[in-house]
């Protein structure tokens, strides 16, 4: 069976990479209001993450009292070369950006749907702004920031003829001084 799988795999992989999949017309619609957070007409920052080849993406700003956050969702209906969730061309900010500097990255554990999950935390700084960014990937109900686990989940989906769609979730809040108040906004 190993020889059979080894012989068939290149043809199957080529089929998967070239199969027609409807991606036209995909739209992400976020709610106008949720748990006291209300959609704002204008963003609080011009910063946006850089994700290549998404089939749908959106970025909206929400306010709740004096708290403000931005939500970015990037959706990949199917994974293909140059249109994949795990890709070195996807990043929060390019190196040597003319306005923004990455001043810190690390892992953080937060509660998502009542379960502790590890997310990526990034701190960005511009001359007059500072941003706290939390990001993670969603693949078949699994949240991860680990690119190896994500690639493993995608390979498993291909092997089992399952969907290989995925999304990146990025939430952002401004801060002054230390990012503690921004973290409270993002967690609520």
Q: Each predicted region: which residue ranges?
A:
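Internal/C-terminal transmembrane anchor helices
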Residues: 1-16
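Residues in intrinsically disordered, low-complexity segments of regulatory proteins
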Residues: 8, 36, 46, 99, ...
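Short secondary-structure boundary micro-motifs
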Residues: 13, 21, 43-46, 106-108, ...
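Alpha-helical transmembrane signal-anchor/signal-peptide segments
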Residues: 15-34
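Residues embedded in well-ordered secondary-structure elements
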Residues: 26, 49-51, 158
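Hydrophobic/aromatic-rich, well-ordered segments within soluble, folded domains that form packed cores
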Residues: 31-32, 38-39, 166, 170-172
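Short extracytoplasmic
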Residues: 32-63
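A cross-kingdom signal targeting lumenal/periplasmic-facing segments of multi-pass membrane
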Residues: 58, 62-186
């Amino acid at each position: 069976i190993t020889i059979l799988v080894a012989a068939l795999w290149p043809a199957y992989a080529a089929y998967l990479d070239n199969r027609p999949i409807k991606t036209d017309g995909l739209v992400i619609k976020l709610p106008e209001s949720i748990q006291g957070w209300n959609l704002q007409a204008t963003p609080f920052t011009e910063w946006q993450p850089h994700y290549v080849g998404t089939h749908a993406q959106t970025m909206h700003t929400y306010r709740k009292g004096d708290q403000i956050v931005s939500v970015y969702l990037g959706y990949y209906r199917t994974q293909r070369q140059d249109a994949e969730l795990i890709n070195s061309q996807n990043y929060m900010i390019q190196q040597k950006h003319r306005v923004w500097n990455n001043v810190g990255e690390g892992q953080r554990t937060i509660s998502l749907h009542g379960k502790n999950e590890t997310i990526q935390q990034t701190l960005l700084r511009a001359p007059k702004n500072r941003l706290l960014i939390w990001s993670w990937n969603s693949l078949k109900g699994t949240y991860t920031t680990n690119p190896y686990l994500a690639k493993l989940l995608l390979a498993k989906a291909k092997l089992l003829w399952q969907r290989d769609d995925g999304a990146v979730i990025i939430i952002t809040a401004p801060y002054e001084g230390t990012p503690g108040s921004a973290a409270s906004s993002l967690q609520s």
